[in-house]
């Protein structure tokens, strides 16, 4: 107990009455001689004020003073009040510092004059209470630690007892101790105790014992020291075993403890995999508690990330279907986000990818593309982009395609990048998808995307590829070719042929220009935008590169930025072939001195290059001057040789060029040429030129899209940041779209009645280029 003198000293220190009186007095205006304060250096005024301007302030103070003490007290009453305050000083201090010691209902008069200004004792109350609680907690903490330290050896023995009742009681006590921080630290510092808890949890058949022991481990797992103790005591296999428990509380404790271990304990991932944790976790995906599912899916993501074996185990356990069901069923944002993260990791696995697609993953992920959660939308887009190359044959994609077209207008660069990439793959070799995208304004949206993207090739390249797919081989292809022009897309498309565009983007743009040239209305605008000189420039550069490599003894095709220069040669020549259908374009092409180069390309060992070279020469040879120039360059010999090509498209174009070159030749020459053409073009089934029937050339046949080939560097994947080390792969699909206006797969060359009828032969040529030219409308 405090002594009387201590209390009196405290009272003196904290008594506000005297201080308040002095302070209040000091605030009043009074006659100051200046001896003590030096406030005045002039004689005071007659009113006794230091400054006559303070009249208003003084009046206000006097008013407030009168308001506060407008009732009169006699001397006896004042002495009585003063006595009451003096008697209750100790109670006021006690009420502030130790309120629990006061008798209930006891009234203590307050010395507070102004409610806005607490007294010294009141200001002391809060910190004194905090100090008291800290001291109490320290005493309790020490007591808990000492109690636990003394009890742990005994409780360890009881947990190992043969009597299950004793074990249960001990487990309950340990669980209670683990709820307090001091005793929890004592438990985790005892390897014997942690081992006993793990062993008891693993071996017990009692539900309550399992709940208490798993709950204890859960409490320990909130500390790094506890995680290490659980790991060293073999807790992970035991916890994995508990994932098969029918009791929800045990399941929750087990999965959350494993989650903490996977997040923070080194070596935990491998231990969980070895204990069969993946299979157990996938089996738990049929539960309905959304928070439990969120933790479980996050565990799966941690285990699968960067580990191919884990991805295959999840696949074998039926994981893709279960994960897709979650995306289709629930609305809890955190669960959808964690599930989409697992699917994103699995979507770069070539084995899991088709399984997710077959389970309806594309449609399920598409449901959340308009969710307000940006992290969920972004994960769904990344996953869809990774899956999209395996989903080109999927049905029921209308809703997804419409949403993707809308997302092209987003201000988020990542969203636009993913949406363009997904559209590029989904429109590849899929007639219905092409129609749908065109019908929902996809052409306009893609052109606008290219215009907005500037030099961001991670956006422009997939957008150009999508346009390339949409402008070829479907019912609305011609409308799409016109729409690109009508939405002011031609200038920006031609501009992409120039620096700083890289070869992959240039390759895609060349293919798009070739498709746009299938529409006669685009011939003049493309010419006016300078497309022809730039195509010739690219052709010359690529051809020189291939020639230089050949002269240095290189036999294998080399890649520049993932693109073979032979592809650029083939693509530019093919685009010029289609553009040459216009007479004015032919004049420009011929004026750029291209005929010698085209003749040289006839000697290429690559059949596709032979065919496009023969094709462009066939168009140019319509003009007599060009036909003479072709002959002057010595084209007769290579063209005659190509008549015997196994590629029927090459042979047909070669025959057409030779025929056009023979227009002004003597009749004997024409007859000899007729015999040569007949014997060459109808080797397997001899017939004469004047026999009716089709030549049967399957020049326009569409090839199947080539699958993903990791050994082919031309197959490139888009990466937008990626998720850790797992590639955000967009495995491109090759699409053979060469003929423009023909929905059917075969475009036979009509039978020609007589070699002398030039126009019949010309009319028999395929209206479009051969679809065997796999370069166009292909990968991203």
Swiss-Prot record:
CDD domains: CTNNAbd_CTNNB1. It is found in: Cytoplasm; Nucleus; Cell membrane; Cell junction. Coiled coil: none annotated. SUPFAM superfamilies: ARM repeat. The lineage of its organism: Eukaryota, Metazoa, Chordata, Craniata, Vertebrata. GO terms for cellular component: adherens junction; catenin complex; cell cortex; cytoplasm; intercalated disc; membrane; microvillus; nucleus. Key downstream component of the canonical Wnt signaling pathway. In the absence of Wnt, forms a complex with axin1, axin2, apc, csnk1a1 and gsk3b that promotes phosphorylation on N-terminal Ser and Thr residues and ubiquitination of ctnnb1 and its subsequent degradation by the proteasome. In the presence of Wnt ligand, ctnnb1 is not ubiquitinated and accumulates in the nucleus, where it acts as a coactivator for transcription factors of the TCF/LEF family, leading to activate Wnt responsive genes. Residues 34-56, 735-770 are annotated as: Disordered. PROSITE patterns: ARM_REPEAT. Residues 735-744 have a biased composition (Basic and acidic residues). One of its GO terms (biological process) is canonical Wnt signaling pathway. This is Catenin beta-1. Keywords: Activator, Cell junction, Cell membrane, Cytoplasm, Membrane, Nucleus, Phosphoprotein, Repeat, Transcription, Transcription regulation, Ubl conjugation, Wnt signaling pathway. Interacts with adnpa. Interacts with cdh1 during oogenesis and in the unfertilized egg. Interacts with ctnna1 and cdh2.
């Amino acid at each position: 107990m405090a002594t009387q003198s201590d209390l009196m000293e405290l009272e003196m220190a904290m008594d506000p009455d005297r201080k308040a009186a002095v302070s209040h007095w000091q605030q009043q205006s009074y006659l100051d001689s200046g001896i003590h304060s030096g406030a005045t250096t002039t004689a005071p005024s007659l009113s006794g004020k230091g400054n006559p301007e303070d009249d208003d302030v003084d009046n206000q103070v006097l008013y407030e003073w009168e308001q506060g003490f407008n009732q009169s007290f006699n001397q006896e009453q004042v002495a009585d009040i003063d006595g009451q305050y003096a008697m209750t000083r100790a109670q006021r201090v006690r009420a502030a510092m130790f309120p629990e010691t006061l008798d209930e209902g006891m009234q203590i008069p307050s010395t507070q004059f102004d409610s806005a200004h607490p007294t010294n004792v009141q200001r002391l109350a809060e910190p004194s209470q905090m100090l008291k609680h800290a001291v109490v907690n320290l005493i309790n903490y020490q007591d808990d630690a000492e109690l636990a330290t003394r009890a742990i050896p005994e409780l360890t023995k009881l947990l190992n007892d043969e009597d299950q009742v004793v074990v249960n009681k001990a487990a309950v006590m340990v669980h209670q101790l683990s709820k307090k921080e001091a005793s929890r630290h004592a438990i985790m510092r005892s390897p014997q105790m942690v081992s006993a808890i793990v062993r008891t949890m693993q071996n017990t058949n009692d539900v309550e014992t399992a709940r208490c022991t798993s709950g204890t481990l859960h409490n320990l797992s909130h500390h790094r020291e506890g995680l290490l103790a659980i790991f060293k005591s073999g807790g992970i296999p035991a916890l994995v075993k508990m994932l098969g428990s029918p009791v929800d509380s045990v399941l929750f404790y087990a999965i959350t403890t494993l989650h903490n271990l996977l997040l923070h304990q080194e070596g935990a991932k491998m231990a969980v995999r070895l204990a069969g944790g993946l299979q157990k976790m996938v089996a738990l995906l049929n539960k309905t508690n959304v928070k439990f599912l969120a933790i479980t899916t996050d565990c799966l993501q941690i285990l699968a990330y960067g580990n191919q074996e884990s991805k295959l185990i999840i696949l074998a356990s039926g994981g893709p279907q279960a994960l897709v069901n979650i995306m289709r069923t629930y609305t809890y944002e955190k669960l959808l986000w964690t599930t989409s993260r697992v699917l994103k990791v699995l979507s770069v696995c070539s084995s899991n990818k088709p399984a997710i697609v077959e389970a309806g993953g594309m449609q399920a992920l598409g449901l959340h593309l308009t969710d307000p959660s940006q992290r969920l939308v972004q994960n769904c887009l990344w996953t869809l982009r990774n899956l999209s190359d395996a989903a080109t044959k999927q049905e029921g994609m209308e809703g997804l395609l419409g949403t993707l077209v809308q997302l092209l207008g987003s201000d988020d660069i990542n969203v636009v990048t993913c949406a363009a990439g997904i559209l590029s793959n989904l429109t590849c070799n899929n007639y219905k998808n092409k129609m749908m995208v065109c019908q929902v304004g996809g052409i306009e949206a893609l052109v606008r995307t290219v215009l907005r993207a500037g030099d961001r090739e991670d956006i422009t390249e997939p957008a150009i590829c999508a346009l390339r797919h949409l402008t070829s081989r479907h019912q609305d292809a011609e409308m799409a070719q016109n729409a690109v022009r009508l939405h002011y897309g031609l200038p920006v498309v031609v501009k992409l042929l120039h620096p700083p565009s890289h070869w992959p983007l240039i390759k895609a743009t060349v293919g798009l220009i070739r498709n746009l040239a299938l529409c006669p209305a685009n011939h003049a605008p493309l010419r006016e935008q300078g497309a022809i000189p730039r195509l010739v420039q690219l052709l010359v550069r690529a051809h020189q590169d291939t020639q230089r490599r050949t002269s240095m003894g290189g036999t294998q095709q080399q890649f520049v930025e993932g693109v073979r220069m032979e592809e650029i040669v083939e693509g530019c020549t093919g685009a010029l072939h289609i553009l040459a259908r216009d007479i004015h374009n032919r004049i420009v092409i011929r004026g750029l001195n291209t005929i010698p180069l085209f003749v040289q390309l006839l000697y290429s060992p690559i059949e596709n290059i032979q065919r496009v070279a023969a094709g462009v020469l066939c168009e140019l040879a319509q003009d007599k001057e060009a036909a003479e120039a072709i002959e002057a360059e010595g084209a007769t010999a290579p063209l005659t040789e190509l008549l015997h090509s196994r590629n029927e498209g090459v042979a047909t174009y070669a025959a057409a060029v030779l025929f056009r070159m023979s227009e002004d030749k003597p009749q004997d020459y024409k007859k000899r040429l007729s015999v040569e053409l007949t014997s060459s073009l109808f080797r397997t089934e001899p017939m004469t030129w004047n026999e009716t029937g089709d030549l049967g050339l399957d020049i326009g046949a569409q090839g199947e899209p080539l699958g993903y080939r990791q050994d082919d560097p031309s197959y490139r994947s888009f990466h937008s940041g990626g998720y850790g080390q797992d590639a955000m792969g967009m495995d491109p699909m090759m699409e053979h779209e060469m003929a423009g206006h023909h929905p059917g797969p075969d475009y036979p060359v009509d039978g020609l009645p007589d070699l002398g009828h030039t126009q019949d032969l010309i009319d028999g040529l395929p209206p479009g280029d051969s679809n065997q030219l796999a370069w166009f409308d292909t990968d991203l």
